[in-house]
């Protein structure tokens, strides 16, 4: 029987950490894991969209997870996203993740070809079978995967006893309510869209996994704690400021993750840039980095 408390709280989506030459950096990976552990977050979501997984090979993804686990394994909840464009590689990453002792694995549906629901279920169950002693979390992100989770598909997946929840990155918060209602009180549903974290909590989310959490974990933790304490007005005020920060970061020409990595560098955490084809920063983006960084610092000083 799994412990739902392991999945309650803030889970930064872990960023890809590269050397200056673009290769995966074990040292920087460990440094970022330690940095986030010290921030007091509940856990990490490793190898997902924010980790640039679709631009990495299987061995690179193994290296990243190995170094995260070596640094913080057993000290926080670790969810490893293991999906690849083919089942065999996904199963290899699932077996590897289980061998390292992660708390859960997760997977998006197969991308590019839009498979029927029974094909998606087979893909997920094949991955889960490769890690039979590890919790499995469905990752619903239809705007990028091209296919969406449905109640019938969730009902089919619930026949697998390892399936404990959904990471929901679809935009309607109603989806969170539907997955939670179908899954029951001990079913994990994680809010995905950072801009509506407080709304996701209100609809029943257990916690959140977010791509911007790592650059401002203090603010998301404050929103979560205030929500749990029933202080909704202040929680909403901070959520609105988080949204303004995200909008500012998204105003750059370079990719959002390049912006956030530059902000982390300003705070002493150099994890490199993004991997092509994600656009790197251009000179005009430096002002955006400075402004967003100042907004984060000011919000933390005001609210945390």
Where do the language-model regions lie?
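Active-site beta->alpha loop and helix N-cap motifs at the rims of alpha/beta catalytic domains
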Residues: 2-148
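C-terminal alpha-helical cap/extension of soluble enzyme domains
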Residues: 6-17, 35, 39, 205, ...
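Short, flexible micro-motifs
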Residues: 12, 25, 46, 50-54, ...
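A general structural signal for well-ordered alpha-helical segments in protein cores
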Residues: 29, 61, 65, 90, ...
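Alpha-helical structural signal in soluble globular domains
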Residues: 39, 63, 67-72, 96, ...
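Short secondary-structure capping/turn micro-motifs that flank functional sites
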Residues: 52-53, 113-114, 174, 198, ...
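Catalytic alpha/beta core domains of metabolic enzymes, predominantly
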Residues: 130, 142-243, 253
